[in-house]
Amino acid sequence: MAKTLDSPGVLVVDFGGQYAHLIARRIRELGVYSEIVPATSLDALGEALPRAAGVVLSGGPGSVWGSRHDEAAAMVLQLGKPVLGICYGHQLLAKVLGGEVGRSPLPEFGPTEVEVLDYGILLNGLPSRFKVWMSHYDAVLRPPGEAKVLARTPGSPVAAMELWGRVFGVQWHPEVRHTQYGREVLDNWLSLVGAPRTWRPGDMVSELVESVKKEVGDALAVAAVSGGVDSTVAALIAKKAIGSRLYPVFIDHGLHPEGEVERVVKLLSRLGLEPVMVDAGEEFLAALEGVGDPEEKRRVVGRVYAEVLERAARDIGAEYLVQGTIYPDVIESGARPGADTIKTHHNVGGLPKDMRLKLVEPLRYFYKDEVRLLAEKLGVPRELIWKQPVPGPGLAVRVEGPITREKLRIVRRADAIVREEVEAAGLGGKLWQYFAVLTASMATGVRGDSRSYGYVVAVRAVESVDAMTAKPAELPWWLLERIARRITSEIPEVVRVVYDITSKPPSTIEWE
């Protein structure tokens, strides 16, 4: 890890809410390093608290009355440093300090207008009314005795409060981009925290290089490269750290999008990362035969990938594996205690625990946009920096149900059509991801004068900043029609094309 709370920063105590990592991300955007610790681990919390300049209590999915988090909140308050409670964290502060928390007279979800009653430090410089993002059934009905009520809404009589000039709570989510003046609220609080605003991930190449150099020592290492920005940046950092003792390895698992292998090899070679090529497509397909469960697919791909990689590393004599694991990978794999596993990430949960290689993950605590800043410093071409992410298991998780050669051929071609048309329309650089999914559904169609029965392809295109949340892209109707026409014309097995308009949450970006 490049940096920890060994130097002053903000600690985000995670109560299991979906936005805990957005809080950390927004604080980093304001120049202050932030880390997350689960509220379920009091030992980890106790160890981290003394090093924090300020603490944020995150949102959470439950009620403060059914929780066991009072002790965690008490530990934070005893620290005597600036505290900010958000949503659940706001209610928890009110509860442990003697306020009243109960069912809101008007549960609020989505955009809500907040009325400022007293600006205090937290709301300084904001208008008297503005829109915020709410998501709560419970509310603070009566503030703690010494608290000053800063704001209210129809469903939250104590929508914001201040105690002793250092403890604050807000019922809304300032970290969500739908909230007006959310950045200003966090900025005001950080001004009180006083932590140094020195978090500039783009300037941390040298620090990361030294960290890898120290970790690997004189040993040999392999870098698992996929051609994505994460694995490429991790490999470049390792290359700078240990030079010719790094061996980039590209495993062709037979699950790549159309033209991906050739494009990746060309780009990596331009960067001085000439990869060791391993063709293992038949091995992966054999292992995936009959496997339909998405989690099992990821585990199978991870297991076979590790086996192939270990064989390559053994031939090379390497002891270390450099991976491009980033923060959202860790989150979605449920690597934090108390969080539900959304899906096993190939980089995190798919690798066996008994793998012989020692893991080196220089980007484990960075978000995607921070990795892109590092990539710019390292001279990575823009076409790779802004290349849309491809899941580690590749097209295996873009085919619902068991994988066959026919299904891979269909989804590979459909995906290529989506990419070609989106990019021809000049929208490629404006979208986070755009791809095709071969669904498990079948539908009736018409070919000529005859009834046909074939596959349904789903098209997915989303806008996002950090992959933590995403919204469906509003693609032009003519573009969607053109994509559907091409897919059904060029792939006769497909009779229907649908467009996925679901946000994340509640869905994930990938279907599996």
Curated annotation (Swiss-Prot):
Gene3D superfamilies: 3.30.300.10, 3.40.50.880, HUPs (3.40.50.620). Residues 9-198 form the Glutamine amidotransferase type-1 domain. Pathway: Purine metabolism; GMP biosynthesis; GMP from XMP (L-Gln route): step 1/1. Residues 199-387 form the GMPS ATP-PPase domain. Pfam families: GATase, GMP_synt_C, NAD_synthase. ATP binds at S226, G227, G228, V229, D230, S231, T232. GO terms for molecular function: ATP binding; GMP synthase activity. It catalyses: XMP + L-glutamine + ATP + H2O = GMP + L-glutamate + AMP + diphosphate + 2 H(+). The keyword Signal does not apply. Keywords: ATP-binding, Glutamine amidotransferase, GMP biosynthesis, Ligase, Nucleotide-binding, Purine biosynthesis. One of its GO terms (cellular component) is cytosol. Its EC number is 6.3.5.2. Catalyzes the synthesis of GMP from XMP. HAMAP family: GMP_synthase. This is GMP synthase [glutamine-hydrolyzing]. The gene is guaA.
